[in-house]
Amino acid sequence: MTRTFVIAGIVAVCLATHGSAQSDKQGVLYRSPGGTTLRLLLDEGNVGPEVSMAEMTFPPNSDTPEHAHGAIEMFYVVSGELEHVVNGKSEILKPGMAGYVKPPDKVRHKTGAAGAKVVAVWVPGAEARKIAARWTREP
């Protein structure tokens, strides 16, 4: 529950201090080789470099490779279930639940038959663009 309030608080502060409109760079969809999609919602184009936010959809029965980020990554599950594995410790996140990972920890995401949709937040915010740069931009 505390993690949910942390995510909501970060986003609320950024929106209150920088405005809430999307920049023309947002809303673009990116797809990973495994089929996960990322749609940028907020980034340096409107909130500055402090934070970025995206909607991510993990396809059914997906399993991302273990990886690390250069920023704090927080997830809020909107639908489905996401197995959030940090340094080998697994937690099942269901709708309404949140999880996070800090650098240099290793993270892996797995889904079941329903897949999962999450809102992801990165602090500092440049991390979302780094992820998107490695994925394919959808038309």
Show the residue positions of the predicted features:
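Glycine- and acidic-residue-biased ligand/ion/polar-headgroup-sensing regions
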Residues: 70-82, 87
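Histidine-centered active-site/metal-ligand motif
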Residues: 67-69, 84, 107-109
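Ligand-binding loop in jelly-roll beta-barrel domains
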Residues: 48, 103-128
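Bacterial N-terminal signal peptides that target proteins for export
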Residues: 1-7
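A short, N-terminal "cap"/entry segment at the start of jelly-roll beta-barrel domains
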Residues: 5, 13-50, 130-139
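Short acidic-glycine-tyrosine-enriched beta hairpin
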Residues: 88-104
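Conserved short histidine dyad/triad with adjacent acidic residue
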Residues: 52-69
